[in-house]
Amino acid sequence: MRGSVLPEWIDVNNHMNVAYYILAFDQGVDCLWEQFGITQHYINVSDSSTFAVESHVTWQRELSADEPYLITAQLLAYDEKRIHQFMRMYHAEHGFLAATAEWLNLHVDLGARKVAPWPDAILSQIAQFAERQEDCGWPAEAGKQINVPKPIYSAMRKD
């Protein structure tokens, strides 16, 4: 998915605000869902959708107003009800990695508001996407935990 940093996305530090990275990645997820057949039509007809239940974002380099970006998606894992994806945001002209996002989504029956299995047609599309990425490997940025290496204070500390 391609986009451009809108001027209203710029914060007091004169770079793209964190909230808009999430927005851009969310739009990237929508593009990925379309490849699987999870469209507005699917949501309306099936009364099913996806809910994000966990995410982790890393910021690598700043983006400024009007700069173009490219978001790519990689499937990390899936099962009959869940999908774990990883996205990268690159500067579309200079090629540098600006940010990454890792998300876990659930397939949900909207009427029951409960997790539900993927329909076979969607699961088949997810499987085909995964097969095309078998050689991609696990991204270095995926599965990270927030950490202060040598904290002065830590709530985890048992001194």
Please report, for each region that a protein language model flagged, where it lies by residue:
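A broad, structural micro-motif
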Residues: 16, 50-52, 98
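GIY-YIG nuclease signature motif recognition
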Residues: 25, 73, 113
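Short amphipathic
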Residues: 1-7
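Short helix-to-loop capping/linker segments positioned immediately adjacent to catalytic or ligand/cofactor-binding
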Residues: 9-13, 59-61
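A conserved, well-ordered hydrophobic junction motif at loop->secondary-structure transitions
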Residues: 12-23
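HotDog/MaoC-like acyl-thioester-processing domains
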Residues: 1, 59, 63-68, 76-159
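Hydrophobic beta-strand-centered segment that forms part of the acyl-chain substrate-binding groove
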Residues: 32-77, 81-83
